[in-house]
Design a protein with these regions (language model features):
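Amphipathic, small/basic residue-rich leader segments at the start of a protein or domain
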Residues: 1-88, 105-109, 113-116, 120, ...
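Glycine-rich phosphate/pyrophosphate-binding beta-alpha loops
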Residues: 81, 130-131, 157-162, 209-210
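N-terminal glycine-rich flavin-associated loop
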Residues: 85-105, 131-134, 143
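A short, Trp-centered hydrophobic/proline-enriched beta-strand micro-motif
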Residues: 117-125, 171
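Cytochrome P450 C-terminal beta-domain/meander region
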Residues: 133-153
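A short core secondary-structure module
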Residues: 149-201
């Protein structure tokens, strides 16, 4: 098997490497020591198209293959773990689920600005009592037929990009179903925008490393999500 990079891939890797060395590395120590979220670096990456590398061009991305995206995250992470995880959480955990499972309307409304870097994404699954075990989570969304809305209650912890994100994929329990002789929780993913009433931020975590990635608690108290955002349990 030949693992040699193509000329196109090598050019992309060199672009990522030069950006990381010239723009990211000089700030890395300060970012980590001061827990500073590097908004200025994110803005530069937006202009270069780093925030939507694997997203198809028709949705505002660069239309590159997974290897190109991996090389970007790798080169950024070599010099600054914070910057690498900001990009990977935004792309893999927020933009990609919308690309893979979202409706066309959701892709136009959320994926396009995410891929262009106009908005930052985050993903909320982890909870204090369950970790990343989706079946163990306590966050729930109940459908309100009177208003045609989902009402979201619960909290998430250790969420990368925290309060700096604009669009969040939030996982919640939306029902129960019997499978293989036992009751299982039905799980749904919701797109929640920053500023939605009932959605606030809690603790900012103190970490041993990757300290600039703004790891926050997300709190949902009767947070209402329009039903047209999509179907449950899919």
């Amino acid at each position: 098997m030949d693992f040699t990079l193509s000329k196109k891939h090598e050019m992309a890797r060199q672009l990522f490497k030069e950006f990381a060395e010239n723009e990211v590395k000089p700030l890395a120590q300060e970012v980590d020591e001061t827990e500073h979220f590097p908004e200025e670096t994110v803005a530069k990456m937006q202009k270069l198209g780093f925030m939507g590398i694997p997203v198809p061009k028709e949705y505002g991305g660069q239309g590159c293959d997974p290897l190109t995206y991996i090389m970007c995250v790798e080169e950024l992470s070599k010099v600054c773990g914070t910057t690498g995880v900001i990009v990977s959480a935004h792309t893999s955990l927020c933009a990609d689920p919308i690309l893979t499972y979202g409706t066309e309307e959701q892709k136009q409304k959320y994926l396009v600005p995410l891929a262009k870097g106009e908005k930052l994404g985050a993903f909320g699954l982890t909870e204090p009592g369950a970790g990343t075990d989706a079946q163990g989570q306590q966050t729930k969304a109940v459908f309100d037929e009177a208003t045609n809305e989902w009402v979201l209650n619960g909290s998430k912890c250790f969420i990368t990009n925290g309060k700096y994100a604009d669009v969040y994929i939030v996982i919640a329990v939306t029902g129960k179903v019997e499978k293989r002789g036992r009751m299982m929780k039905e799980i749904s993913a919701f797109i929640v925008e920053k500023g939605t009433p009932g959605f606030t931020f809690g603790t900012k975590e103190k970490k041993m490393g990757i300290r600039g990635s703004a790891t926050y608690e997300l709190i949902f108290e009767d947070c209402r999500i329009p039903a047209e955002i999509g179907r449950a349990h899919v």
